[in-house]
Swiss-Prot record:
Keyword Cell membrane among record annotations: yes
Record function comment: NDH-1 shuttles electrons from NADH, via FMN and iron-sulfur (Fe-S) centers, to quinones in the respiratory chain. The immediate electron acceptor for the enzyme in this species is believed to be ubiquinone. Couples the redox reaction to proton translocation (for every two electrons transferred, four hydrogen ions are translocated across the cytoplasmic membrane), and thus conserves the redox energy in a proton gradient.
Protein name: NADH-quinone oxidoreductase subunit K
Transmembrane segments: 4-24, 30-50, 61-81
Subunit composition and interactions: NDH-1 is composed of 14 different subunits. Subunits NuoA, H, J, K, L, M, N constitute the membrane sector of the complex.
Family: Belongs to the complex I subunit 4L family.
Matches recorded under InterPro entries: NADH_UbQ_OxRdtase_chain4L/K, NUOK/Mnh_C1-like
Record field: catalytic activity: a quinone + NADH + 5 H(+)(in) = a quinol + NAD(+) + 4 H(+)(out)
Native organism: Burkholderia cenocepacia (strain HI2424)
Single annotated GO MF: NADH:ubiquinone reductase (non-electrogenic) activity
Signal peptide limits: none
Enzyme class: translocase
UniProt record, GO biological process: ATP synthesis coupled electron transport
Length: 101
């Protein structure tokens, strides 16, 4: 039987993997976006675990809102990346530090 602690450890591991992904790979924007999405999924895992543990559905409902915002963020982020790649031929973070009007 899985307890609340198992789900919280899983969420902590997923969150730690996402943090490591951001700090180890600061050059590729796609990896950074994927790491942020993994962070949000770790938080959603904790929301569902606490919601199930407390017998309340508010945490599960909140997960739908977080997933909606995460999907919109991913779509907008990837659209911006495609535009930047077409203009600059790179997606490295170090090359995207200049703003041009």
């Amino acid at each position: 039987m899985l307890t609340l602690a198992h789900y919280l450890v899983l969420g902590a591991i997923l969150f730690a993997i996402a943090i490591v992904g951001i700090f180890l790979n600061r050059r590729n924007v796609i990896i950074i976006l994927m790491s942020i999405e993994l962070m949000l999924l770790a938080v959603n895992t904790n929301f569902v675990a606490f919601s199930h543990y407390l017998g309340d559905v508010h945490g599960q409902i909140f997960v739908f809102f977080v997933l909606t915002v995460a999907a919109a963020e991913a779509a907008i982020g990837l659209a911006i990346l495609v535009t930047l790649f077409r203009k600059l031929d790179t997606i490295n973070v170090e090359d995207l530090d200049q703003l041009k009007g």
